Each structure stands twice: as structure tokens, then as C-alpha cells.
């Protein structure tokens, strides 16, 4: 499932924000705004997906989508929730079109503004422009 989410995140970088990126199997180094949503496969497996963006990246995403050069904290949080929904929603579509298990998702929730250190089964960092996006998945 994590590979499907990473594919969706790469698609987000390439097609939504149109920025070059690289992926590493590491934790983000910067302090990030973090959101999560829960995923349940049709087999009954449950996971929590985390998406986090540092302030540089989420502001850049906000500027791309909203045209705001300097967004307030509430707008950045809303943009993070929308980014999380776009990425995990895209992963759901990818799963439907491939051999991966289908799943349902909940509404994204704001988690925290801190280091990306929550317990998880897998972590990846996507380096985009001068920013970082963290992706993590945890079985529930």
C-alpha cells in the first residue's frame, strides 16, 4: 500500500504542482505540518497514512493552488489537508486500476506541527524544490 501512496505522491509532484522531486527511504529532517487519514482495505486491514510538508513546501503548494505568496497558518493547514486528500485519493484510484487491494479512506485530520517522528511501519521523504514532504504508513 505504501508503494501505491508513493506513486500517487509522485503523480502529485509531476502533474499537480509540476516540480521535480526525489524520494528517499528516510524521515524528513525539517519540522513539518502533519495530517493523517485512516484507510481500510476491503479485506478489513486498517492503516493510518501520514502526509507532512515543511513550511517552505506547503507555502509553495498554497501559492500554486491559491495564488497566495504568504498564507496564514489556517490556510496552510487547510492546504495540507487538501494535499493529503489529493494524494491518498489518487492512491485509491491507482489501487482500483491495478492489482493492489481496493480501500476506503476517511476525511483527513490535522495531526501536529512538529518533527515527523510518529511510530510507523514505513517512512519516505520526497524532496521537492527547497522543501520536504514526508509520507508514512502505520498498520492499526
Annotate each language-model stretch with its function.
Residues 1-140:
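N-terminal auxiliary interaction/assembly segments of multi-subunit proteins
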